[in-house]
Amino acid sequence: MTQKPMHSSNTLEAIIVQSAAAARPPERMTVSQAAERYREINSPGSYVGPWKNDTTPYLVEPMDILTSTEFTSMAFVGPSQCGKTDMFSNWLAYAVKNDPADMMLVQTGKDTARDFSIRRVDRLHRQSPLIGEMLVGTAEDNVFDKQYTSGMMLSLGWPSVKVLSGRPIPRMWITDYDRGGAFEDVDGEGSGFDLAQARTNTYRRFGMTVAESSPGFEVENPKHILKTRHEAMPTPGILALYNKGDRRRWYWRCVKCENPFEPDFSLLHWPDSEDLKECSENAVLRCPHCNQIYAHDTGTGHPSKREMNIAGRWVRDGQHWMPNGEMHGVPTRSDIASFWLKGVAATFSTWDKLVFKHLSAEREYESTGSEKALKATVNTDQGTPYIPKMLSSDRAPETLKARAKDYGHRTVPPGVRFMTAAIDV
């Protein structure tokens, strides 16, 4: 269907106005600032109004990395319901209004690319007038290609060598990187990320390749000993990209003991009850250092998830977030800025649903032996890789290390000639 032009150029005055707008230098701002300036959300029953960065504060730093010349790639690991795909919409808004350059979004298949174009891109144009007015609106526009008055083009594709090995494009975005293994080996030519990155190489530090996804591959070696605090268990897909990057994780700072910690599903606590609703509705999070209680909602008398997210920080592997706000330590360096957000901190997910789905899946496994529901909730809701039951063991290195007890320093009595030590395994 042919779109009507968004602008009228029937008069000399209109032509002059449009030419002046095209020649005007872009206003200097970050992607997150552009999102608040230009992006409108119209989701009746959920939220209607301008984009607000404090709704998903953990997206600000990854969004602003997209225009950094320090990195050529970004990997974002996160659960569903965290808003990670909105980063692309905000990047597009920034590009259209401030810094035009061709972009391509690669979905898991042709049908999902078409759906993304209709549900995401077209809605962005309709709901955000300042973005929609930049469409050329000619007959050349179609569901897979969008042209803008600045001359930039947005293309939507899917994992195939033909799509991923064409002309150079400075800005590439791969969504749902782990879904169905579609990007693991594209037509025998290599990973989707490597093929996409090859398209941006021409632009060197001004090119950017992004992959985002919740984890989708199983941990194959649960006994692997992690070498750094932020390293992920080795799996293919998005977590492999994360490990190649500078490995940032989202931290909260305890309001009581002031120690930073990563909000993780393992820190949630609930009553010991056969009633799953009772368990999930009373779930709270406890600080791993001092047991301070945190609640999901505000108004409970305990610090809430929203309050903690607003004060949260991304911490690179090798760094330590000090009480005065400074980062100490030597951060891991890489051309890939990589982020890993867990489901407990996701804005649009609730702790009661996380707990209910997990306990329901555990109960299903106990009664049927099926791990499908458990794997799904661990991957997509909790945002972590799944370890199959047959591979999990209480003798895993992390489990044994966690059991260690500090007996302190003892004094050897005078006259002792030697000491022995024995370990029972």
Give residue spans per PLM region.
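Phosphate/NTP-binding elements of NTP-utilizing enzymes
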Residues: 2-297, 304-423
